[in-house]
């Protein structure tokens, strides 16, 4: 049940031309990757330019802005120590400039090639949520990750009266399992 989500459109010419007619004028949700024919962007400014073209192109083709999930593309922190903040700055800029658009990412890319990835992933998830990220591709069976996400959502002001946090506590997601 629910609405289908198309993974994904980008500014890579062949992909854009193939996917746009599939989503144009529909109620489908679409992941919009900040990627172009020039390759992976490295800076926030590069991501914003791509996001702008993708979002405006989709909206112009009757895709509801609430159905657009921009993925600014997480790159491994082990290859360049600026990649974490470039991604986080991109999330903040996209959510500020394009009201109603969602942001999401494949979180574990940040820790690729590093030991004890779960700690990096959990901390990066919290940082990204604080900057406005509202969708994550994660392992939902990682109880500690789920607890971190629920807590971050609460601290970011997205959990009225801490209801989700309290529900997660009662369900044993946060705290000692029952």
Feature map (PLM): residue ranges:
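Metal-dependent catalytic core segments for phosphate chemistry
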Residues: 22
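Catalytic alpha/beta core domains of metabolic enzymes, predominantly
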Residues: 25-174
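Catalytic beta/alpha-barrel core
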Residues: 4-13, 34, 82-83
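Short, charged, surface-exposed secondary-structure boundary motifs
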Residues: 13-19, 40
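N-terminal active-site wall of soluble small-molecule enzyme domains
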Residues: 1
